[in-house]
UniProtKB/Swiss-Prot annotation:
PANTHER family: TRNA N6-ADENOSINE THREONYLCARBAMOYLTRANSFERASE (PTHR11735), TRNA N6-ADENOSINE THREONYLCARBAMOYLTRANSFERASE, MITOCHONDRIAL (PTHR11735:SF6). Keywords: Acyltransferase, Cytoplasm, Iron, Metal-binding, Transferase, tRNA processing. Its main location: cytoplasm. This is tRNA N6-adenosine threonylcarbamoyltransferase. The gene is tsaD. It comes from Aliarcobacter butzleri (strain RM4018) (Arcobacter butzleri). Substrate binds at L129, V130, S131, G132, G133, D162, G175, N272. It is found in: Cytoplasm. InterPro entries: ATPase_NBD, Gcp-like_dom, KAE1/TsaD, Peptidase_M22_CS, TsaD.
Length: 333
């Protein structure tokens, strides 16, 4: 068994995964959404302090499995430096005290392997990764052969939902609330520009779309009636459709070059139902197999880290206590 730790942002999570069967023996996550919501986003120092409180509590529940463990795995990149450090510090201490090898896991590979929790790998596969920090198209041939073929030039899909929600005073995290508000809105009321629609390049951008939404909100706020609840519904609906349309346009261009046999969407923002529906239709049109993470595994969790760690364990991909470090960003897989 492998004990895995996730603390890259605002979720404290520990899991135990069986190596031979990929079975998830134990998994628990403590979210910090409530504590950060009053600030409209994640406060790194607060997140780190909350990890200090939560991780030991979760670990206490796992002690019965310690004699069965073969390795300790931990997310070491990418993420917030102060929160990554809490997980890595715990992992190093466990590695030393239990005399077990240490496995450093790429958080983004974790999101990809969230598709395979308690399942076998399906490779090669092309993946759309959408989260608060990333919007990427990735071609994965194996665990150690992954290539980013498209990325954002500024902001991410998930971050734009958080920003729109904040501008409308709807709270954090923005993804679920914007999705909920959009159900009551008119997608055609506000004419929002689809980013990079005239560009032949396969890349993403959300800064311009966020600015366009901001201008509509300011215009409504300065009107005699002010901004009404229905206005918020309509803005959310128009924004969500445009944000997803942008992704769909770029995916269609990508598929003109190469149609993969297997396609997947992963990351916290992949829980968006409208995005899932649009991609499902596109995959059916191109006869592609579509793979989706279970909704409970879309956001950050240690189960996906453990699933990657199983494959790294088989390859004896270990790292020493002295060598492991944290990285807030990574350029390639």
């Amino acid at each position: 068994m492998i004990l895995s730790i996730e603390s890259s942002c605002d979720d404290s999570s520990i899991a135990i995964t069986e190596i031979k069967t990929n079975k998830l023996i134990y998994h628990k996550k403590i979210s910090q959404e409530l504590q950060h919501s009053i600030y409209g986003g994640v406060v790194p120092e607060l997140a780190a302090r909350l990890h200090v409180e939560a991780l030991p509590k979760i670990l206490e529940e796992c002690k019965e499995y310690f004699p069965l463990l073969k390795a300790i795995a931990v997310t070491n990149a990418p993420g917030l430096s102060v929160t990554l450090m809490e997980g890595v510090t715990m992992a190093k201490a466990l590695s030393i005290s239990l005399n077990l090898p240490l496995i450093a896991v790429n958080h983004l590979k974790g999101h990809i392997y969230s598709l395979f929790i308690e399942k076998q790998e399906v490779l090669p596969i092309t993946i759309l990764l959408v989260s608060g920090g990333h919007t990427q198209i990735i071609e994965a041939n194996s665990l150690n052969d992954m290539k980013v073929v498209a990325t954002t030039i500024d902001d991410s899909f998930g971050e734009s939902f958080d920003k729109v929600s904040k501008m409308l005073g709807l709270g954090y995290p923005g993804g679920p609330v914007v999705q909920e508000y959009s159900l009551k809105g008119d997608v055609n009321r506000f004419d929002l520009p689809i980013p990079l629609s005239q560009s032949p390049k396969i890349e993403f951008s959300y800064s311009g779309l966020k600015n366009a939404v901001r201008l509509h909100i300011e215009k409504l706020e300065n009107s005699e009636e002010g901004i009404r609840e229905q206005d918020k519904y309509d803005i959310c609906a128009s924004f969500q459709k445009t944000a997803v349309d942008h992704i769909m346009q770029k995916l269609k261009k990508q598929f003109k070059q190469k149609v993969p046999k297997n396609f997947a969407i992963v990351g916290g923002a992949s829980a968006n139902i409208y995005l899932r529906t649009q991609i499902d239709e596109l995959c059916k049109k191109h006869n592609m197999n579509l793979y989706l993470s279970e909704l409970k595994y879309c956001s950050d969790n240690a189960a996906m880290i453990g699933r990657v760690a199983v494959e790294q364990y088989k390859l004896k991909d270990f790292i020493s206590i002295e060598e492991i470090d944290i990285q807030t960003r990574i350029k390639e897989f």
